[in-house]
Design a protein with these regions (language model features):
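Pyridoxal 5′-phosphate
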Residues: 1-379
Length: 379
């Protein structure tokens, strides 16, 4: 059976260049980067090189890069380690569970946590954000750069201008979950005025189990994982060097190829949406309009009235089409999307949405097969 993977926002296959680098590093490197002997020094040199290459791709400095086990740990490190003691935390209403649950944990511990509203397409209300921050004690602001389910891109430039208009006493540290943004739209975290940003290698063709937290030198961060003092004391534990080396290759290529990726996936996504509209009566696109610059080019969140993701996703899988009914970070469960519930959709509609996310190598032939399967299963 020919299978079609349209769940690239969950993970995208390891690209050949990253795989080659992973295997090279596994064979070539036998030392611990923290050891002082020759093998350790060679490993340290490779680690430093990967750090500098990722930093250059992101437009930041190598000493500001902290390696983690993935995007979830990077987000947790920013939320728990970047929120000053006794200071408030402000989060977007549609955050990934790794931010949402971290915020809930702080709230249970007595911290003031504020949810910032969004419009019906998932765009952050910057006027409400500024009103919530003005006159308050400076804390931490965490808003995802791009939503993993809707594909909505946050108004980062508007947010920057709002924050610049605040007094120093009220201006928070600013963290963004950039896991879905990397390689899909051009952005530079430092130019935007961010203080911290989280990334995940496997979303851009790198290996699983590697994340990056960029933390500007000016931002105070407390470590959450302590022990041997690796990563300049910010994240203890021996680094997964072969995977980090492969991640550097994948991130470099994702940034270098971003313009081509954006153009190609936007064109294919628009074509896919037109076919869905004509094939499935009542199908509705959630999030920004298909041509909007506020939408990730590869992501469609489609509401299919009367559908139930608990039944539909496995049925589509049996036919060879791999999609999701929301975020992949739910232990394999198919629950009503918290994102859609937060937007005011009822539980039935929140179960009736499919996320289709294209990748770098998605072909027109695969999309034709996907439409055939959708038409047969849902039409």
């Amino acid at each position: 059976m020919n299978r079609v993977h349209l769940d690239h926002n969950a993970t995208t296959p390891l690209r050949a260049e990253a795989r080659a680098e992973l295997l090279r590093a596994v064979d070539a490197l036998r030392g611990n980067p923290s050891s002082v002997h020759a093998a350790g020094r060679a490993a340290r040199a490779e680690l430093d090189d990967a750090r500098e290459r990722i930093a250059a791709a992101l437009g930041v400095e190598g000493e500001e890069i902290i390696f983690t086990s993935g995007g979830t740990e990077a987000n947790n490190a920013a939320i728990f380690g970047g929120t000053p003691q006794g200071a408030p935390l402000y989060v977007g209403a549609l955050e990934h569970s790794s931010v949402r649950e971290a915020a809930e944990a702080l709230k249970r511990a007595g911290r003031a946590v504020h949810s910032l509203p969004v419009d019906p397409s998932g765009l952050l209300d910057t006027t409400a954000m500024k009103a919530a921050l003005e006159g308050q004690k400076a804390g931490l602001l965490s808003v995802m750069a791009a939503n993993n389910e809707l594909g909505t891109i946050s108004p980062l430039e508007e947010m920057r201008l709002c924050l610049e208009g605040l007094s120093c006493a009220s201006r928070p540290l600013w963290h963004a979950d950039c896991v879905q943004m990397l390689g899909k739209r051009r952005f530079a975290p430092r130019e935007l005025g961010l203080d911290m940003a989280s990334f995940s290698a496997h979303k851009v063709g790198g290996p699983l189990g590697v994340g990056v937290l960029w933390c500007a030198k000016s931002a105070a961060l407390s470590p959450r994982v302590v022990g041997g003092g690796q990563e300049s004391g910010m994240r203890s534990g021996t680094e997964n060097l072969p995977a980090i080396a492969a991640a550097a290759v994948a991130i470099e290529l994702a940034v270098a190829e971003q313009a081509l990726y954006t153009e190609r996936t936007a064109r294919l996504s628009a074509s896919l949406w037109r076919e869905i509209q004509s094939s499935i009566p009542g199908a509705r696109l959630l999030g920004p309009a298909i041509e909007s610059p506020a939408r990730l080019p590869n992501t469609l969140c489609v509401l299919l009235p009367g559908a139930d993701g608990r039944v539909l996703v496995p049925r589509l899988d049996l036919e060879g089409l791999e999609v999701s009914a929301g975020s992949a970070c739910s232990s394999g469960s198919i629950e009503p999307s918290p994102v859609l519930l937060a937007l005011g959709h009822n539980e039935a509609d929140a179960r009736a949405a499919l996320r289709l996310s294209l990748g770098r190598d998605t072909t027109e032939e695969e999309l034709r097969l996907a439409i055939k399967i959708l038409r047969t299963t849902c039409g």
